[in-house]
């Protein structure tokens, strides 16, 4: 890692599970007998906006009670000390930002942002409850979570930035992702095809095509190799 010039870091749900953030696999994927994919989609919001917002407020409360762990902190401190690092995360919890990471490409959006359903304007939002559904301060129309839902596309500017990092990377550090969620899975494969060395940190089995696989918790391994 010390010899790497251009590093692409890709993080998934696994880096935040050590902070207590649910992964939505198995029982954690259910809320009031509904599976998370039944709520995280445009059709569900159009039909039941109050229900979807209630679920997202519950998610905010859960994440607000969590703290960035040693892996988040190690990545943030390491990135601030050097140039040439791009962090792309599949997570929406905001823990990288809370750890002080200087620049995060959050592919799937953020729990802590609202977006107007009419004009598209986004704003930061920390509310954990709403007495009434949130509306845009710009136009007064209904806001939604600024999250990329099922059946939606990742914003083009985030994809372009990520692809540029893939093309320039000589090293890819993959932390806590199964390797099946697109487009992050394609980023890893593309970087490896371009000649980058892929290092995976994950205590669980994954489909990441890594040159080096470290089967250890990120909170134990990253503070060691990034110092």
Question: What residue spans do the PLM features occupy?
Answer:
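Conserved catalytic core of sirtuin-type NAD+-dependent deacylases
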Residues: 1-227
């Amino acid at each position: 890692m010390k010899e790497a010039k251009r590093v692409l870091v890709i993080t998934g749900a696994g880096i935040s599970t050590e902070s207590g953030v649910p992964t939505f696999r198995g029982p954690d994927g259910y809320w009031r007998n509904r599976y998370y994919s039944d709520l995280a989609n445009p059709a569900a919001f159009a039909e039941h906006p109050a229900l979807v917002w209630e679920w997202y407020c519950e998610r905010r409360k859960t994440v607000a009670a969590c703290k960035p762990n040693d892996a988040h902190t190690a990545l943030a401190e390491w990135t601030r000390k050097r140039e040439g690092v791009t962090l792309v995360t599949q997570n929406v919890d905001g823990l990288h930002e809370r750890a002080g990471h200087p620049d995060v490409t959050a592919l799937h959006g953020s729990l802590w942002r609202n977006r107007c359903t009419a004009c598209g304007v986004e704003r930061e939002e920390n509310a954990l409850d709403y007495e009434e559904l949130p509306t845009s301060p710009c136009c007064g129309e209904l806001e939604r979570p600024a999250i990329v839902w099922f059946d939606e596309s990742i914003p083009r500017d985030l994809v372009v930035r990520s692809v540029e990092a893939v093309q320039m990377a000589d090293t890819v550090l993959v932390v806590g992702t199964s390797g099946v969620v697109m487009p992050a899975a394609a980023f890893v494969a593309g970087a490896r095809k371009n000649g980058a060395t892929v290092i995976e940190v994950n205590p669980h089995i994954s489909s990441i095509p890594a040159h080096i696989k470290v089967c250890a918790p990120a909170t134990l391994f990253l503070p060691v190799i990034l110092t």
